[in-house]
Regions:
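Acidic-basic catalytic patches of nuclease active cores, encompassing PD-(D/E)XK
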Residues: 1-47
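Catalytic cores of nucleic-acid endonucleases
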Residues: 6-11, 67-123
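Short, well-ordered alpha-helix to beta-strand connector turns
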Residues: 34-35, 51, 107
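Charged, well-structured alpha/beta interaction segments
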Residues: 42-58
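Conserved catalytic cores of phosphodiester-cleaving nucleases, focusing on short active-site segments
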Residues: 53-74
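Conserved hydrophobic/aromatic positions in well-ordered beta-strands
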Residues: 54, 111-113, 128
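Short, solvent-exposed coil/turn segments at beta-strand boundaries
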Residues: 58, 105-106, 131
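Non-catalytic C-terminal interaction segments of nucleic acid-processing enzymes
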Residues: 115-193
Length: 193
């Protein structure tokens, strides 16, 4: 599939994510229920395994794939994104599917926050946290049914999943958050179903 994004800069996008991480460590800690967050941006774990950071929860270290979206994508604010088509080596689909393999490192959770401004602030954001191995089983099913490509949006060069579909298609491992002024105001978990 062709990448139809206009004026996309990987470096600018990375700087945008890093601005969020540096100004919102406490929000990441709250979303993950963690004591400490270690940023791994641009390290080999980020580049090769898709692990942007590690959340420390007591003695456990949890790998996180972090996704941050700007308010300009308001139309997609209730979507969850995996970048790049599956046939590309750098597709985020591969990092997620790796969670089903015991012989490679992969993120334990995907944390996507939609609506973050250029300064890393969440005036009105929505977030979804997904346990990677749970989502990988759903992804694998979509691949086997030849339906994954139905979710690919060439203009964004990404797969776009509606958060509500991910929430209902998996039986656990998905948490949903509303954030106002960098503070979590509402939560929902499909573990509660």
């Amino acid at each position: 599939m062709e990448d139809l994004r206009k004026d996309y800069s990987f470096q600018k996008n990375k700087e945008y994510e890093e601005t969020f991480t540096s100004t919102n460590t406490n929000l990441i800690l709250d979303l993950m229920g963690a004591d400490k967050y270690i940023d791994l941006s641009q390290t080999f774990l980020d580049i090769d395994a898709g692990i942007d950071g590690v959340a420390k929860i007591e003695k456990e270290n949890i790998g996180i794939a972090l996704r941050i979206r700007k308010p300009d994508y308001f139309k997609y604010r209730y979507n969850f994104t995996l970048g790049h088509h599956f046939d590309k080596e750098n597709s985020q689909v591969h990092a997620i599917l790796n969670s089903l393999r015991p012989d490679v490192m992969s993120p334990n959770f995907i944390l996507q926050i939609n609506g973050v401004d250029e300064n890393g602030y969440c005036e009105e954001c929505v977030a979804i946290k997904i346990q990677t191995d749970v989502f990988a089983r759903y992804l694998k099913e979509l691949i086997q049914n030849n339906t994954l490509d139905n979710l690919f949006v060439p203009r964004l060069a990404s797969y776009e999943f509606q958060m509500k579909d991910v929430f209902h298609e998996t039986n656990s491992g998905v948490d949903y958050y509303y954030i106002e002024n960098n503070t979590i105001t509402k939560t929902a978990s499909n573990d509660d179903n």
